[in-house]
Amino acid sequence: MSSWRKIYYKLLNLPLKILVKSKLIPTDPITELRLDTTRPILYVLPYHSKADLLALRQQCLEQDLPDPLNLLEIGDTELPSYVFIDNGPRVFRYCAPKQESVKIFHAYLDLHRNNPNLDIQLLPVSVMFGRSPGREGQNAPHLRLLNGIQKFFAILWLGRDSFVRFSNTVSLRYMATEHGTDKTIAHKLARVARMHYSRQRLAAVGPRLPVRQELFNKLLASKAIEKAVSDEARTKKISHEKARQNAINMMEEIAANFSYETVRLSGRVLGWTWNRLYQGINVHNAERIRRLAQDGHELVYAPCHRSHMDYLLLSYVLYHQGLVPPHIAAGINLNFWPAGPIFRRLGAFFIRRTFKGNKLYATIFREYLGELFARGYSVEYFMEGGRSRTGRLLDPKTGTLSMTLQALLRGESRPITIIPIYIGYEHVMEVATYAKELRGATKEKEGFFQMIRGLRKLRNLGQGYVNFGEPIPLIQYLNNHVPSWRDSIDPIEFHRPEWFNPTVNQLSEKIMVNINNTAAANAINLCSTALLASRQRALTREQLLEQLDCYIQLMRNAPYATDVTVPKKTAEELLEHALQMDKFEVDKDSMGDIIILPRDRAVLMTYYRNNIQHLLVLPSLIACIVIHHRRISREALLSQVAIIYPLLKAELFMRYSKTELPEVVNTLINELTRQCLICNKEHGMLVLNPARIRPLQLLAAGIRETLQRYAITLSLLNANPVISRGVLEKESRMLAQRLSVLHGINAPEFFDKAVFTTSVNTLREEGYISDSGNAITANTQELYQVLGELMSPEIRLTIESVSLPPEHNDTEESAREG
């Protein structure tokens, strides 16, 4: 580089260093994009901009990537390390690639023709200052193609809202070998790069935002809403104008009022907030979502719902991953001042808890959601309908998912893909409130003063986790499950086909399973699992470290799913981090430390344990069977797991099918054997290892309460085979509450209504309850026999004494009196 050019770049870099603070996407490009720093890199930028080049250079130097201002020396040839595809501020879609970029591409391709060992990486990079999509009807916003003056003001105003995004590399060796090295290939390469940047820009910025009143006018003109308004006027005996005004009021209540400036400013505030409240936000698998957005998919984000923080955290993460924040379905309870107006400008649209008896509202909401899809906006909704109070996934509510499929059946929207998302925390600010509600306290209404009280609790929140699960493309899903689904497409009116409801239910289950497939284990939920497994909720430091190591090795060596994230830290490091969170106490004496989970916090910590219970429930079941039988064959153990597994699968949204189960169980047995928790004797007999009995017992305790709940329901069914479903669920809960008092079981989900409902439904599906509602006693007795052998005698005695038939209890009482 000539000396005058160096001076020029240094002078230009001085104000940029002050004004520009770019965020890198992805945050670790070398690892996430698998960049080979030993091979030469040619940086490809969309258009000529020295400011963009220097912003790129700053990030390259920070990431130990080659300096784009240095020339690439290949043999006797020197070529620039960067290339601009376009050369100026003109309308992007109509400008052809400039000859200079084609010339540089051709020079590099020619080098590959003459040097068979050469393999240069093309690294596409885009630099964005601001991401406002603009409003419909306005002139094009200043997104990318800016002249010098426009660029100066963009940097001045948006320099701290800039992004440098790296894409996957392209091998020039592959291009040269597969497509040749002549000038037409260089032209094609430049043209493909231009298309890549155009798609990437749309994925990052999104479609233009609607003018709110024009959107309402379009909705009011739809045939479905016109009919609903007429029906409203007729059934309520009001004027058509009054019914129409009701419809407008409902639209005002529902519709978002998305504002880029609010998103940008809130991003600054939230960034400051997260840095002070959280020790880190861990994001996994975001690249797969960026790829889908760039390929033109309509994205529906379906996260689990742990906290009110979920809304803000996910939008913040998506924005900083180079994606458009979605329109979010939020409960109407959050539409209070000042949160409601702010959420609305951040993309929230509000939904009532029930549509029952309000056809006009249901129609307007369905049409509004369909319009969002038709315009290409990403959407977010919580499948569970509300925040989980137990830390487990709730049964999915399918209303909004049904409307999503209805939008697809209009035939108007782009390909819709659902993104299951696991959101996890080391501290949930509402967890104490959840515990009170599960004990029967009335749910507090959200409002300004409650929000202020909540903000006061925001401190020392540890780590946060946002894991993007395996996407579910709806068209592909329907092609596989309902090949004739296209016959039901109707752009005017939705007619519910026979396959619709069963398919929605199956799809909702798959979404929940995929959420669990991407769970995040962390220091808090692992320590909580171990301490809650101890009878006295206390372990020595050595015992706790041993147990943490057991869990970590299980998750690493016999992973539940490939997307599950397991801490890279050692057990010692995890424990130190957990102790810093002030959730556990340490009792020190001359013999060492004892880690204690105080009784008043135990019920709160079950929430965190339940976040990952599905990851450890099968190894826990295997450990439980081995402990209670002491000696058992693999075949017998597998048989017992197979008979219990359907109940676990339904309750915890587990991923394994019945056919996959034997291989999974064998893998887990091998891992437990490798850890010396159990021993594999001759003839395939499995026995416990006395030297490692404690970690095996703690592992087994993880499923203890779950098996007791199943035994309660089975015992009641055996005692009264004709018991009605409602009475069975009610008496199961009552018996569970009694058992929890008598035996000190301090877990809110132990007598949760939804858990027993799921269990009873599964028993019916698995053939334990007939279509007429009566128990099939041969089956229920067989299952209860298996469960009974896995419980302590005192627990079994309590269950059986309470669930005996009334006449049996009378006889026993008379015998005692006599």
Curated annotation (Swiss-Prot):
Top-level taxon of the source organism: Bacteria
Keywords: Acyltransferase, Cell inner membrane, Cell membrane, Lipid biosynthesis, Lipid metabolism, Membrane, Phospholipid biosynthesis, Phospholipid metabolism, Transferase
Pathway terms, separated by semicolons: Phospholipid metabolism; CDP-diacylglycerol biosynthesis; CDP-diacylglycerol from sn-glycerol 3-phosphate: step 1/3
One Pfam family it belongs to: Acyltransferase
Bilayer disposition of the protein: Peripheral membrane protein
EC number: 2.3.1.15
Motif HXXXXD motif in this chain: 305-310
Main location: membrane
InterPro entries the UniProt entry points to: GPAT/DHAPAT, GPAT/DHAPAT_C, GPAT/DHAPAT_LPLAT, GPAT_PlsB, Plipid/glycerol_acylTrfase
Gene Ontology MF terms: glycerol-3-phosphate O-acyltransferase activity
One biological process term in Gene Ontology: CDP-diacylglycerol biosynthetic process
Gene Ontology CC terms, in alphabetical order: plasma membrane
Free-text comment on this protein's domains from its UniProt entry: The HXXXXD motif is essential for acyltransferase activity and may constitute the binding site for the phosphate moiety of the glycerol-3-phosphate.
NCBIfam families: plsB (TIGR03703), PRK04974.1 (NF003441)
UniProt name for this protein: Glycerol-3-phosphate acyltransferase
Protein source organism: Photorhabdus laumondii subsp. laumondii (strain DSM 15139 / CIP 105565 / TT01) (Photorhabdus luminescens subsp. laumondii)
